[in-house]
Amino acid sequence: IGARTTESQVHRQLVSGLSMPVGFKNNSSGDYDIATNAIISANHKHCFYGINKEGGGCIVTTSGNQYCHMILRGSIYSTNYDERSVKAAKESMANNKLSRHNVMIDCSHGNSCKDYRNQSIVMAYLCEQFAKNKDYGIGVMLESNINEGKQKLIFGEKDKLKYGVSIT
């Protein structure tokens, strides 16, 4: 779940009904508590208005998702893949009595200073950390597109999209 939607109650409720691992990214200001709160919420049962298999409205009841983790994506201010940051993220989860303190590190976004070419630097550092400590994290994320850059999707201008370039 992305940095901007980690605070969304709807996303937290939907995740609570999934029986698979789901990651919540720290927000773009670097706050771990928001992702921790999202994990806490998704761990619990929820009841909300949804749509049934026939397309009608219904009340959906979930049992909670115990397989959530935090994704460190950096922030608009700094990176957060270093040892101190990973420790702080895990402490945020531990201090809130979460039984799992799983962290995945995103090599892109704020951790690459929004330059895809820096992902290899982040990955090299993480390889060293994982070699020293197998519990450093549960994995890494890399961002890859066929062509570099990003583009906006503008209503009615789908034909102007460039192939293989991220739509943001």
What are these regions (language model features)?
Residues E91-N95, Y163-I167:
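Catalytic-site microenvironment of enzymes
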Residues N96-L98, K132-D135:
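Short helix-capping segments at alpha-helix termini
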